[in-house]
């Protein structure tokens, strides 16, 4: 699975399926045939017919923004492309995991952890090759760290978690030309890499832990590209090398990818002759399924569910979304030079009471009931229920609207209601905020305007950024470009999460994706406690997670919005389809039972 990183999703109402960005990116053991359930959904489709030889799979990802093709994981932050890269290896992920996201053997590489020596030894398969037939080497693994830690490449993936590797902080700061903590026992052209840590962490047995990387990048192919040009080079956008069962034959910028089998793939030979993967707009996706244009569409949102649940020729699969939607407050800026969030913005939102009041004023349950078709529920915390071993029903958040409590909090903070305007004032200044809501599904505008009206009920004046919703990719750039913009106060985000639930990479003091730029010593302590040696004890780690969730809700630097079930309509000619998080070889196993799509 592609779990080394968190990925932004376009919809903040309900999170869409990221099918097969995960299930196919590393290609693992075998397609699940278990009758797994998620809510009322089947997780896998059991086609009674066998796959024919060959065939072309027609797939789409629903998005109203163009995909941003970038095959190097360290330089990518686009959920659309993260999913669409799956047949090629999901940006070249290495490791197999079980359904609980723990590393297992048998993938493109294996990892062995040694607590005494504080090391991880990564061993690449001897037959692991790039799609041009060249060997995947130890240097290719190390090069991925360079693309993230060297500021010249422009990556926004640097975090405190990676700083736990010996020498990587010095390399990041320009104090060293090489990474002393990453060595090659058999040389750079060998297949073994040793990573030296400052300390071991309890989450290191889980994929997506963030303490070491899980991908490779073709060093020999890319070494002559200047760092500043790498993100825009055809070698990483339209003409990449990959390690998956398929390779891209043609990439149309922003629109589509045509895949054909990779003859150098180390695993099982794919059943299909080709895969066509396109971007389809929200306005056209349901009609496309109704006319049997696609075998399945990723990224469909809850508001469309009623339109597709009974479509002839399709079976709707579902899974617990490994995702969270939330609301951010803009509290500071990101100091890229020192890799630190600085909470220094002059705003009423620095007051905890104001942040809590805005959270309590939202009617998230009403919104979910009206627009999600039963696929989302108000979130009580930032940890989704798929990580049930780290959550607790005792954690109370902002699931229920409480206008009385919101008004009381603002009263206590000295914000007086001006009856002539209907808005609150303090020290001669009106409580007026800018809401950087962005395009999502068809209901995004309605939901944003609804929240603006709820905030008006407690005397908080909120207006949309430039009077309208932001285009999604523009919003991403606005939020992720250091030091961060000072022209917004509130925004919404949705994340496809890593499969190790520690949230260092989202909310640590150094995390670039800490969009609100808060920096709180108690939250830092909570995050560090979750990843401390004491948390090797599962009971202790759960307690640490619960405290973290409670503290985040109390301080309200961000406010949880929804948990979700994701769903995907699958044409009944498809064979071997599953959303099981433990299925790693889906792109090799998937096939079709007929040349034409099913219509009944």
Curated annotation (Swiss-Prot):
<keyword id="KW-0449">Lipoprotein</keyword>
<keyword id="KW-0571">Peptide transport</keyword>
<feature type="lipid moiety-binding region" description="S-diacylglycerol cysteine">
    <location>
        <position position="23"/>
    </location>
</feature>
<dbReference type="GO" id="GO:1904680">
    <property type="term" value="F:peptide transmembrane transporter activity"/>
</dbReference>
<keyword id="KW-0472">Membrane</keyword>
<dbReference type="Pfam" id="PF00496">
    <property type="entry name" value="SBP_bac_5"/>
</dbReference>
<comment type="function">
    <text>Part of the ABC transporter complex OppABCDF involved in the uptake of oligopeptides.</text>
</comment>
<keyword id="KW-0564">Palmitate</keyword>
<keyword id="KW-0732">Signal</keyword>
<keyword id="KW-0813">Transport</keyword>
<keyword id="KW-1003">Cell membrane</keyword>
<feature type="lipid moiety-binding region" description="N-palmitoyl cysteine">
    <location>
        <position position="23"/>
    </location>
</feature>
<dbReference type="InterPro" id="IPR000914">
    <property type="entry name" value="SBP_5_dom"/>
</dbReference>
<keyword id="KW-0653">Protein transport</keyword>
<keyword id="KW-0614">Plasmid</keyword>
<dbReference type="InterPro" id="IPR030678">
    <property type="entry name" value="Peptide/Ni-bd"/>
</dbReference>
<comment type="similarity">
    <text>Belongs to the bacterial solute-binding protein 5 family.</text>
</comment>
<feature type="signal peptide">
    <location>
        <begin position="1"/>
        <end position="22"/>
    </location>
</feature>
<dbReference type="InterPro" id="IPR023765">
    <property type="entry name" value="SBP_5_CS"/>
</dbReference>
<dbReference type="GO" id="GO:0042597">
    <property type="term" value="C:periplasmic space"/>
</dbReference>
<dbReference type="InterPro" id="IPR039424">
    <property type="entry name" value="SBP_5"/>
</dbReference>
<comment type="subunit">
    <text>The complex is composed of two ATP-binding proteins (OppD and OppF), two transmembrane proteins (OppB and OppC) and a solute-binding protein (OppA).</text>
</comment>
<protein>
    <recommendedName>
        <fullName>Oligopeptide-binding protein OppA</fullName>
    </recommendedName>
</protein>
<dbReference type="GO" id="GO:0015031">
    <property type="term" value="P:protein transport"/>
</dbReference>
<dbReference type="GO" id="GO:0015833">
    <property type="term" value="P:peptide transport"/>
</dbReference>
<dbReference type="GO" id="GO:0043190">
    <property type="term" value="C:ATP-binding cassette (ABC) transporter complex"/>
</dbReference>
């Amino acid at each position: 699975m592609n779990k080394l990183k968190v990925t932004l999703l376009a919809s903040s109402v309900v999170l869409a399926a990221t099918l097969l960005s995960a299930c196919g990116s590393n290609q693992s053991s075998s397609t699940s045939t278990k009758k797994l359930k998620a809510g009322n959904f089947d997780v896998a489709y059991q086609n009674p017919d066998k796959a024919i030889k060959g065939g072309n799979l027609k797939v789409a990802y629903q998005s109203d923004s163009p995909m941003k093709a970038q095959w190097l994981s360290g330089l990518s932050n686009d959920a659309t492309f993260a999913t669409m890269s799956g047949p090629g290896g999901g940006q070249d992920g290495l490791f197999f995991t079980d359904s609980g996201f723990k590393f297992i053997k048998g993938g493109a590489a294996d990892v062995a952890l040694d607590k005494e020596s504080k090391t991880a030894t990564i061993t690449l398969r001897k037959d692991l090759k790039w799609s041009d037939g060249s060997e995947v080497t130890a240097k290719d693994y190390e090069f991925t760290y360079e693309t993230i830690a060297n500021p010249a490449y422009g990556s926004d993936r640097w975090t405190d978690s990676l700083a736990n590797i010996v020498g990587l902080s010095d390399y990041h700061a320009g104090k060293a030309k090489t990474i002393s903590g990453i060595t090659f026992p058999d040389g750079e052209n060998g297949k073994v890499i040793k990573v030296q840590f400052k300390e071991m962490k309890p989450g290191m047995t889980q994929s997506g832990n963030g303490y070491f990387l899980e991908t490779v990048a073709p060093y020999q192919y890319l070494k002559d590209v200047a760092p500043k040009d790498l993100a825009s080079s055809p070698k990483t956008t339209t003409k990449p090398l990959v390690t998956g069962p398929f390779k891209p034959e043609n990439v149309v910028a922003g629109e589509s990818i045509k895949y054909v089998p990779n003859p150098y793939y180390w695993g099982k030979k794919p059943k299909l002759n080709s895969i066509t993967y396109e971007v389809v707009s929200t306005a056209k996706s349901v009609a496309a399924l109704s006319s049997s244009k696609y075998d399945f569409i990723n990224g469909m949102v809850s508001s469309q569910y009623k339109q597709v649940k009974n479509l002839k020729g399709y079976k709707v699969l579902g899974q617990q979304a490994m995702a969270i939607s939330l609301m951010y407050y803009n509290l500071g800026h990101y100091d890229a030079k020192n890799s630190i969030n600085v909470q220094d913005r002059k705003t009423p939102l620095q007051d905890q009471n104001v942040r809590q009041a805005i959270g309590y004023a939202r009617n998230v349950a009403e919104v979910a009931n009206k627009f999600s078709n039963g696929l989302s529920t108000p979130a009580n915390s930032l940890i989704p229920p798929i990580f049930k071993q780290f959550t607790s029903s005792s954690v109370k958040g902002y699931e229920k609207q409480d206008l009385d409590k919101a008004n009381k909090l603002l009263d206590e903070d000295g914000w007086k209601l001006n009856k002539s305007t209907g808005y609150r004032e303090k020290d001669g200044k009106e409580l007026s905020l800018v809401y950087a809501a962005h395009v999502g599904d068809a209901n995004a505008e309605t939901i944003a305007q609804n929240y603006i009206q709820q905030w008006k009920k407690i005397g908080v004046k909120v207006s949309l950024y430039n009077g309208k919703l932001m285009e999604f990719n523009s919003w991403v750039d606005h939020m992720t470009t250091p030091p961060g913009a000072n022209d917004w106060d509130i925004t919404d985000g949705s994340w496809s999460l890593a499969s190790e639930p520690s949230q260092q990479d989202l909310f640590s003091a150094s995390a670039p994706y800490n969009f609100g730029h808060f920096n709180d010593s108690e939250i830092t302590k909570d995050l560090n406690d979750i990843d401390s040696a004491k948390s090797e004890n599962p009971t202790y780690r759960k307690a640490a997670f619960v405290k973290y969730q409670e503290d985040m809700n109390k301080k309200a630097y961000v406010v949880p919005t929804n948990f979700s079930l994701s769903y995907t309509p699958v044409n009944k000619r498809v064979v071997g389809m599953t959303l099981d998080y433990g299925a790693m070889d889906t792109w090799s196993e998937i096939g079709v039972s007929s040349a034409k799509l099913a219509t009944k």
